[in-house]
Swiss-Prot record:
This is Cytidylate kinase. One of its GO terms (cellular component) is cytoplasm. Its main location: cytoplasm. It catalyses: CMP + ATP = CDP + ADP; dCMP + ATP = dCDP + ADP. One of its GO terms (molecular function) is CMP kinase activity. ATP binds at G10, P11, A12, A13, S14, G15, K16, G17, T18. GO terms for biological process: pyrimidine nucleotide metabolic process. Keywords: ATP-binding, Cytoplasm, Kinase, Nucleotide-binding, Transferase. The lineage of its organism: Bacteria, Pseudomonadati, Pseudomonadota, Alphaproteobacteria, Hyphomicrobiales. Pfam families: Cytidylate_kin. It comes from Bartonella quintana (strain Toulouse). It comes from the Bacteria. Belongs to the cytidylate kinase family. Type 1 subfamily. It is found in: Cytoplasm. The keyword Transmembrane does not apply.
Length: 215
């Protein structure tokens, strides 16, 4: 049976990661936050005090990166997110990680992948695709509150500026720019909580996953 794949894309702080985890738990599917794969490489470079534009080292770390060792708690900092978005501009690095992400989707009977190019590049043939969006003020507020909950200090306006820069990098990069797949379900989470978003997504997934099982 062909693996069942759910693709979830969207900009930073749109809620895609939280939705992906809830969906994976609900349907008992494997989950991959593809952003962590870029963060993992960025973390390795910074740990060795190497420049983020050190392409040779970045490619070497990407090739030997074991997705099973990626720890969200270790890789979730804002600084690593910024670093990851910068190394993601390296075409050869994206090629390596995209190939490994596709392998992940092939290996397991069912999986949920979230990122910025899942429905368009990594898994264009995914069984169902979602694209989450929210206005930038809402996303900045979410990120601000996330940081405060961790006991760290944060500046809302600084976060807003960083998100604007991140969106610009993601949307304008030449390889795998952030955009919605033509056949993706658009979910605007600006006014939606995670539970409401989850219910909408499940209502769309249920008939498709049932049909897949019957096949």
């Amino acid at each position: 049976m062909k693996p069942f794949v759910i693709a979830i894309d969207g900009p930073a702080a749109s809620g895609k990661g939280t939705l992906a985890r809830k969906i994976a738990t609900h349907y008992r599917l494997r989950h991959l936050d593809t952003g962590l794969t870029y963060r993992g490489v960025a973390h390795a470079l910074l740990q060795q005090k190497l420049a983020l534009n050190d392409e040779k080292s970045a490619l070497a770390y990407a090739k030997k990166l074991d997705f099973n060792t990626l720890k969200p708690a270790l890789l979730s900092s804002h600084e690593l997110g910024e670093a990851a978005s910068k190394i993601a501009l390296i075409p050869a690095l994206r090629d390596i990680l995209v190939a490994k992400q596709r392998d992940f989707a092939r290996i397991f009977p069912g999986s949920v992948l979230d990122g910025r190019d899942i429905g368009t590049v990594v898994c264009p043939d995914a069984d169902i695709k979602f694209y989450l969006l929210a206005n930038i003020q809402t996303r900045a507020k979410r990120r601000y509150q996330e940081i405060l909950k961790k006991g760290a200090q944060a500046d809302y306006h600084e976060i807003l500026a960083h998100l604007e820069q991140r969106d610009s990098r993601d949307i304008t990069r030449t390889q795998s720019p952030l955009k919605s797949a033509q056949n993706a379900h658009l979910l605007d989470t600006s006014e939606l909580g995670i539970e409401a978003t989850f219910k909408i997504a499940c209502a769309l997934i249920d008939p498709i996953i049932k049909a897949h099982i019957i096949e």
